[in-house]
Structure formats: C-alpha cells, structure tokens
Amino acid sequence: MSEGNIKLLKKVGLKITEPRLTILALMQNHKNEHFSAEDVYKIFLEQGCEIGLATVYRVLNQFDEAHIVIRHNFEGNKSVFELAPTEHHDHIICEDCGKVFEFTDNIIEQRQREISEKYGIKLKTHNVYLYGKCSDINHCDENNSK
C-alpha cells in the first residue's frame, strides 16, 4: 500500500478502501493510457482481483469528481479516464482502433489564446480532440486484436 496514495485519498476526502487503492495504483502505473471502466474491470478480472464492475464505475466517478482522474468521451460518447496530468496536453484518436495519442503544440495553444482574447473571453481551460485514422494499417490491426 502506497503511503502517498493513502494521503491523496484522505486529502480529497475519500475513505481508504482496497478498491480505491487498487484502481489508483493501476492508473498510476499506466500514466499515459486511457481506460474505460470496462477496461479496468477486465484487467482486474485477468489478475484474479475481485472488484466488481459497479465498484469500478463508482470509484472512477469519485476520482473524477475529486480531480484525481480526468474523464474524456472519445469514442461515441464512451467515457475513458486518465490520471490527471501534471501538464496540459491534447489528444488525437484513431476512429478505427481507438488508439489515443497525446500531444502538445505551442502554436495551437497560442492561437487559442488569441481567439479567446478576440472574443473577450478569459480562457480557463480547453480540450482539443482530433479524430482520424491510423496511417499504418498494421497499427490498427494490432490494436483491434487486443
């Protein structure tokens, strides 16, 4: 049990439970990945960990409300979660295999600031999702077979 995770859960007002600690550890061990509740459930099922799907949904929703994870609705409004990043990034999503690539681009960031200033809006946050198809069909085949 990670002492840091216990402190984090206490800090955001969540009770320390085995499912919360287990799900948090999974998210931390896969910082650049995006998981649906079903993905998390299947991983635990394969590991022989007895955490129910309803519990996974509930914990991920609690983590989202506590800003431990961020919820995205990439694929047809299906929620996926990633550990709350320390630095801003945007996403490119393949419509065929669902692979998510993270990127940062200073030109895009600057242009968004210019546009918000033009309209007199003080920009707080934003999300950029770019959708397309993998240029390497083998990449999609590999992801779809998993």
Swiss-Prot record:
Protein known as: Ferric uptake regulation protein
NCBIfam families given for it? PRK09462.1 (NF006999)
Iron listed as a keyword: yes
Which molecular-function annotations from GO does this UniProt entry contain?
Answer: DNA-binding transcription factor activity; transcription cis-regulatory region binding; zinc ion binding
- Which Gene Ontology cellular-component terms appear in the entry? cytosol
Q: How does it assemble?
A: Homodimer.
Q: Which residues bind Zn(2+)?
A: H34, E82, H91, C94, C97, E102
Task: Write out the ranges of the annotated region (Dimerization).
Answer: 86-146
Pfam families cross-referenced by the UniProt entry: FUR
Keywords per UniProt? Cytoplasm, DNA-binding, Iron, Metal-binding, Repressor, Transcription, Transcription regulation, Zinc
Note down the stretches annotated as region DNA-binding.
1-85
What is the recorded function of this protein according to its Swiss-Prot or TrEMBL entry? Acts as a global negative controlling element, employing Fe(2+) as a cofactor to bind the operator of the repressed genes.
Q: Main site of residence?
A: cytoplasm
Q: Which InterPro entries match?
A: FUR (IPR002481), Fur_C (IPR043135), WH-like_DNA-bd_sf (IPR036388), WH_DNA-bd_sf (IPR036390)
The subcellular location is: Cytoplasm
- Protein family: Belongs to the Fur family.
**Any single biological process term in GO:** negative regulation of DNA-templated transcription
Which residues participate in Fe cation binding?
A: H88, D90, E109, H126
